[in-house]
């Protein structure tokens, strides 16, 4: 939408007015503004995003985590841990760790083990998903 495009250029202004728009427009604005803010610095991104409602923060954090998962998985994991909604947080962490474990399994497993936001059963579930993913990728087909 045109409003989302404006958010790419004027993220602070658009986020300050976020409550004036419908939920689907808010989501697009948040995504575009997140990219624009993160280009400046991660600190700018976090400062502005922290002023949003919890639901809108979750959208921004999930988007940013997905964006970082290929280039900076540790930071992606850290951002995913900021998500308030437990189900969304778990999905985002699992997604990040699945990508991360493809090129640095040890670091991914360490991040899971060190997380204070994941329960023991969630840690076990994510770890087993990684093991299954790695096992299936090591199968040699005739």
Spans of model-derived segments:
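Non-catalytic all-alpha helical scaffold/repeat segments
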Residues: 1-142
